[in-house]
């Protein structure tokens, strides 16, 4: 009885992992197909436009929960609570340049 429960749990886990992997593959944009050799300029222009769009999609900035006003207030509270601890060497990296 216990063995069949373990097999069932493992099969459900495997199914969930496959579903997550499959959804992750479909969520990422596909790279445009490169034109054939000797392609006309119109086809090259269309390819470069699609390539530029693809690069813009995969390199765009993603805005998340840190941009909401609620987290700004909680960030201030978190900073004050960590600085009030004696001997705390908490360093914030917000001022460093992003590469």
Swiss-Prot record:
Keywords: Amidation, Cleavage on pair of basic residues, Hormone, Neuropeptide, Secreted, Signal. Pfam families: Hormone_3. The modification Tyrosine amide is found at residue 63. Residues 65-99 form a propeptide. It is found in: Secreted. SMART domains: PAH. Residues 1-27 form the signal peptide. GO terms for biological process: feeding behavior; neuropeptide signaling pathway. The keyword Protein biosynthesis does not apply. One of its GO terms (molecular function) is neuropeptide Y receptor binding. InterPro entries: Pancreatic_hormone-like, Pancreatic_hormone-like_CS. GO terms for cellular component: extracellular space. PANTHER family: NEUROPEPTIDE Y/PANCREATIC HORMONE/PEPTIDE YY, PRO-NEUROPEPTIDE Y. Belongs to the NPY family. Gastrointestinal hormone and neuropeptide. This is Peptide YY-like. It comes from Dicentrarchus labrax.
């Amino acid at each position: 009885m216990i063995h069949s429960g373990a097999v069932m749990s493992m099969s459900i886990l495997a199914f969930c992992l496959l579903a997550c992997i499959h959804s992750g593959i479909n969520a990422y944009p596909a790279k445009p197909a490169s034109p054939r050799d000797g392609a006309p300029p119109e086809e090259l222009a269309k390819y470069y436009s699609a390539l530029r769009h693809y690069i813009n999609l995969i390199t765009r900035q993603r805005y998340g929960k840190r941009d909401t006003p609620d987290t700004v207030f909680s960030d201030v509270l978190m900073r004050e609570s960590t600085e009030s601890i004696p001997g705390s060497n908490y360093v914030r990296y917000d001022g460093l340049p992003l590469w």
